[in-house]
Amino acid sequence: MKVIAILTLLLFCSPTHSSFWQFQRRVKHITGRSAFFSYYGYGCYCGLGDKGIPVDDTDRHSPSSPSPYEKLKEFSCQPVLNSYQFHIVNGAVVCGCTLGPGASCHCRLKACECDKQSVHCFKESLPTYEKNFKQFSSQPRCGRHKPWC
């Protein structure tokens, strides 16, 4: 039963990433950690928390914080639905699209680039990753509002 609940959560409650499964593969390959089990619910911004003051660099670089994902939505792109192709060459992510030119390909490439930025930030902040901040977003310490930038 728990497996079904987790899969439902993954499919319907992960609006912060384009193609969750591709994002998961990239995070795992680049950081060695699971996107869902290591980052979802981390701090105040990773996952659906999205409020309060970021607790550390990992949280500050979360895709939920003000990000390129918001720009994608402004251009009528659907980051959750835009699957894309990518390859990892010498540790670097290379985004691709086989659909040819057009809005759909544009959205897919931009979604890939957004994920690329997030994964790169997660990699850079690995030394300061703190296990105590997992599932932290439900804590009252996160507050109710996003900080003003």
From Swiss-Prot:
Cofactor note text: Binds 1 Ca(2+) ion per subunit.
GO molecular function: calcium ion binding; calcium-dependent phospholipase A2 activity; phospholipid binding; signaling receptor binding
Residues reported to bind Ca(2+): Y45, G47, G49
Biological-process GO terms, alphabetical: arachidonate secretion; lipid catabolic process; phosphatidylcholine metabolic process; phosphatidylglycerol metabolic process
Main location: secreted
Top-rank taxon: Eukaryota
GO cellular component: extracellular region
Compartments, as annotated in UniProt: Secreted
Record-annotated disulphide pairs: C44-C142, C77-C107, C95-C112, C97-C105
Pfam families named among the record's database cross-references: Phospholip_A2_1
Keyword terms of this UniProt record: Calcium, Disulfide bond, Metal-binding, Secreted, Signal
SMART domains: PA2c (SM00085)
Cofactor: Ca(2+)
Range of residues in the leader sequence: 1-18
Gene3D superfamilies given in the database record: Phospholipase A2 domain (1.20.90.10)
UniProt keyword annotation of Signal present: yes
Family note: Belongs to the phospholipase A2 family.
Record-linked PANTHER family: INACTIVE GROUP IIC SECRETORY PHOSPHOLIPASE A2-RELATED, PHOSPHOLIPASE A2 FAMILY MEMBER
Role, per record: Inactive phospholipase.
Protein name: Putative inactive group IIC secretory phospholipase A2
Classification of source organism: Eukaryota, Metazoa, Chordata, Craniata, Vertebrata
Gene: PLA2G2C
